[in-house]
């Protein structure tokens, strides 16, 4: 079995890349098992945070159950408890879930979801498993040590990613911001923007801190594959075919068709975009002031590649 973890930050092109690779031969695709759509992931986030920071030797049984199920094929759990948990989780508004993760009180339905939620389960037919995550930047070493997946890190120009973060209102959890601020100060001597700073400055800080975590961990693992979204866009069919080969996955006509068909207009969470337009898309979406705010924040981080990625 080939196990692959495709990791990146939100709006970095991970959905497009993962879907392309999911069309290679005999691949079971598990989409964000640690994300915001599942009751067990919510249970995990309530314990470890939205972006868990775990050292390799740290004991985290619930997080381990989540990833064990994901790398075994990631089937949704069956049984009455799991179904009730998911139903309870989805019965409340997104804002109610956000408030719970931020420590502002847990609604009764979410308490039920937490108590009854079950992790993903094995798929006995899974030959190769591809897992995509945008929440594991601070736990990659922990995941690597336990499950030994091949790891692909996808980076994107922060100006493009942050244009999407701004439009979609990302980074709304004050407890997560405080946690990242403490880590950035302790590890890199980088201070978070002051409370009255523009929202975009706080978004850029979160992007910088999480990207710094990705890159600093990747530097210790030369066997990991680091890919830039802009490079994939240059010649998507050939770039993805080469990436699949590096991972030991067999490229298929379905994969080729998906990549070519996705090269057209799209917006929001859709995976369709005109690939050649994406590297410079930020120029149409950000003002000069926006760019100055982003670059000013990212310039504080020690790796020049953070402001350049």
Regions found by a protein language model. Give the residues of each.
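PAPS-dependent sulfotransferases, especially Golgi type II membrane carbohydrate sulfotransferases
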Residues: 1-5, 10, 52, 56, ...
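Hydrophobic/aromatic beta-strand patches that form the interior of the parallel beta-sheet core
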Residues: 4, 28, 150-153, 225-227
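Short catalytic/ligand-binding loop motif for oxyanion handling, primarily in non-cytosolic enzymes
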Residues: 15-18, 37-39, 137-140, 160-164, ...
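A conserved segment at the C-terminal end of the G1
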Residues: 15-27
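PAPS-dependent sulfation machinery
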Residues: 32-129, 175-193
């Amino acid at each position: 079995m080939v196990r692959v973890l495709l990791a990146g930050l939100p709006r970095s092109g991970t959905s497009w890349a993962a879907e392309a690779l999911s069309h290679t031969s005999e691949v079971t695709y598990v989409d964000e098992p640690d994300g915001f759509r599942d009751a067990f992931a919510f249970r995990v986030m309530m314990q470890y945070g939205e972006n868990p920071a775990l050292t390799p030797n740290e004991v985290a049984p619930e997080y381990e159950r989540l990833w064990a199920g994901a790398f075994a094929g990631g089937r949704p759990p069956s049984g009455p408890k799991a179904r009730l948990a998911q139903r309870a989780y989805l019965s409340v508004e997104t804002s109610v879930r956000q408030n719970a993760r931020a420590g502002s009180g847990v609604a009764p339905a979410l308490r039920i979801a937490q108590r009854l939620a079950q992790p993903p389960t094995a798929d006995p037919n899974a030959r190769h498993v591809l897992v995509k995550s945008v929440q594991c930047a601070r736990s990659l070493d922990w995941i690597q040590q336990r499950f030994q997946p091949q790891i692909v890190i996808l980076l994107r120009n922060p100006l493009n990613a942050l244009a999407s973060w701004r439009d979609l209102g990302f980074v709304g959890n004050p407890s997560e911001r405080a946690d990242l601020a403490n880590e950035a100060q302790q590890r890199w001597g980088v201070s978070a923007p002051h409370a009255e700073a523009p929202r975009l400055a706080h978004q850029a800080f979160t992007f910088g801190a999480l990207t710094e975590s990705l890159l600093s961990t990747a530097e210790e693992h030369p066997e990991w594959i680091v890919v830039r979204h802009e490079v994939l866009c240059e010649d998507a069919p050939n770039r993805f075919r080469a990436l699949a080969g590096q991972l030991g996955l067999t490229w298929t006509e379905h994969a080729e068709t998906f990549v070519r068909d996705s090269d057209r207009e799209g917006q929001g969470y859709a995976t369709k975009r005109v690939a050649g337009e994406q590297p410079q898309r930020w120029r149409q979406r950000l003002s000069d002031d926006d760019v100055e705010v982003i670059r000013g924040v990212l310039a504080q981080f020690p790796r020049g590649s953070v402001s350049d990625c």
